[in-house]
Amino acid sequence: DFRLFTMDNVAEEIAFRARVIRDCDTKPVIAHAWGGGAITCAQLGGMAFDDWKNAKVFDKWGFSAFPRDAKSASTLAMGCDATRCAADGKEFWQSELTAGMWGTGLHQGGRMDDDTFLNLSLESIRHGAKGLLYWQFRKERFGAEFGGYAMTDYDGGPTNLSRCAGRLGEMLKRNGDVLSAGALPRAEVAVLFSIRSYLAVWLSNGRHENKAAIDAVNGYYRVLWEENIPVDILHEEFFGDLSGYRLIILPCACAVSPAFAEALKTYIAGGGTVLSDPYFGAFDKDMQLSYAVPGYGFAEIFGAREDDIREGDAREIVYRSETHRVTGLLMNETFRDVAADALATYADGTPAILSHKWGRGRAILSGVSLGNSCAEGALISDDILADGQNRQSTLARRVVLDLCADCGVRPNPCDAPGVKASVYETDDGNGCVILINSAAEPAEGRVRLNASYAACSEELGAPHASLADNALRFRLAPHESAVVRLLAKR
């Protein structure tokens, strides 16, 4: 309760400050969240801030992020989507992106290469950021961060990073009309951010950190991100109408709010599909242990009750006749009173993932924490170090993508593995495509377009772009990023 009170107290304090500023000036009041935002804060119990509550009082919103390398790109993207959703239609900026140099004092990590700098910058843009601010121009001369985080040399002279930022800035000037006004596809999949569950994880261990909760969310998000499937991040208090989503994923929902649990019942009854981690609703509205798990009456909806639960690191699970060894698990749950179908089983034949029809919808309950089994393991702040475990679970990937296909979610528009693609389209018939090759090998493929265009022009990079059959053909070097302008037919 004290942590939730602190979040409310912070929100009230910044609302007061915003009112004072507005009493003195008519210009927009702008602020941003620290270190990746609440969804990637591993010390959320200690810092106790809620982006959704804080963003409400400002005219524009943003967040800061300090990814160390391109391997942190999915965590950066997740932070961007969370910030976009917290802004709730307001313009949001990437307000403090690393300028490309990591480290301070005598512990320097050196400058990023151009490919990594462009990757992280364009990742922010393609997830909704309408502007980029970097920390910072020159190296600090004193203080805890002396010598670090600079885009320029000691005296403000040019580096590869400042030159790269210049090229990126020129591209944004030429194409800002499309990137600002162009529409991205609406998200058909949503991932829950349960801030109460983050706090439960933070309080439940002696380390006072909630890294496992971040990994739970990131693992699911990463599977979708790798397939260019747009995602909304749902806050358990500020979620609106759920009926537009084909699939809602519930990572680390042990203390999900009662209001969201009730909304889920309506969503499933109306034909929606949910996929939940184990231990759903284990804590009630007062954060006391529930009398039954799943909580909030969801045993009927999931078609089973929990029999036993324990921590675990590895399990063998059979899914569609294939055996998968799953590691990095936070929870292992077994079931009783099972009325649901077994979507997957443990090695002993008992149900591991349950699927149950309820109303006109479908509720899937996993006995293992699928998100934790495929998390990037990265943080984009400096609160604690990541554990370095970058996991890739074929089971999690298959389950999530099979569910997306079953629910009719729009498939990946790009046929080149490892390439991230975003298509912007405007009402006047113009467009832009952002391409990022995250692989260490060259990539060649096509991106499906929703309209036909007269021509295309290469605005950043050298992607060998051409148009054919309502698709953009491209060829990218390893780790290359590119932007292609699509020109309207007249």
Model-found features: residue ranges?
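Distinct, well-ordered alpha-helical segments
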Residues: I39-N54, S243
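Active-site neighborhood of glycoside hydrolase catalytic domains
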Residues: D1-H32, G45, K53-V57
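Carbohydrate-binding surfaces of carbohydrate-active enzymes
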Residues: A15, D23, K27, A55, ...
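Aromatic- and acidic-residue-enriched segments that line the glycan-binding/catalytic groove
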Residues: D1, Q43-F49, G206, A292-G295
